[in-house]
Regions:
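Short glycine-/small-residue-rich Rossmann-like dinucleotide-binding loops
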Residues: 1, 149-150
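NAD(P)H dinucleotide-binding glycine-rich loop of Rossmann-like/cofactor-binding domains
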Residues: 2-79, 110
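Mid-domain Rossmann-like dinucleotide-binding core that forms the NAD(H)/NADP(H) cofactor-binding site
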Residues: 48-127, 131
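Short beta->alpha connector loops
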Residues: 82, 150-152
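Conserved amphipathic alpha-helix within the SDR
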Residues: 129-139
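Rossmann-fold NAD(P) dinucleotide-binding segment
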Residues: 141, 152-155
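N-terminal Rossmann-like NAD(P) cofactor-binding module of classical short-chain dehydrogenase/reductase
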Residues: 146
Length: 155
């Protein structure tokens, strides 16, 4: 829970709060015990739980894409096609980049990314991804690489 008093909280950057008790377990639990000064966003009962559950990963995806400054001439590579990566894929399309390439080891997720419009989807267990990206971009590579696997080895 952000303290609301430190430098970062005063700037609205609650995720950088200096308070050592800033992170509590159970964010996706049905019930949680919170301090009375906690920032709480109540989800309306008319929003289905499945849709409400996507608010957090999609907000992360939107924020990440917005931070890139992505434009129409960019080749974008998104590594990791789970909820956050698929969100990045969709938000990237709103920026109309030159091409979006997805990377994942899960063939089912690769197929979904293709159906959503990825120009190419690569599986690092089946091909040398860097070489293939260089082939697809005439040796240029990508302007924007977005990591959504959570695996340090993929960065």
């Amino acid at each position: 829970m952000p303290c609301g008093k430190c430098y970062y909280c005063k700037k609205g950057l609650y995720h950088l709060c200096d308070d050592e008790n800033g992170f509590l377990e159970g964010g996706f639990a049905e019930y949680m015990l919170l301090p009375k000064n906690a920032l709480i966003h109540k989800v309306s009962k008319d929003i289905p739980a499945v849709e409400a559950a996507l608010c957090e990963p999609l907000s992360c995806s939107a924020y990440a894409v917005n931070q890139t400054g992505m434009g129409m001439e960019d080749t974008v590579v998104i590594s990791g096609l789970g909820a956050i990566g698929m969100g990045m894929l969709q938000f990237a399309f709103l920026r109309n980049p030159k091409r979006v390439i997805g990377i994942d080891t899960n063939d089912a997720l690769c197929e979904i990314a293709k159906k959503l419009g990825a120009a190419e989807v690569l599986n690092p267990m089946k091909e040398y991804v860097t070489k293939r990206i260089m082939e697809l971009t005439d040796g240029v590579g990508c302007e924007i690489y977005m990591e959504a696997t959570g695996n340090p080895a993929s960065a």
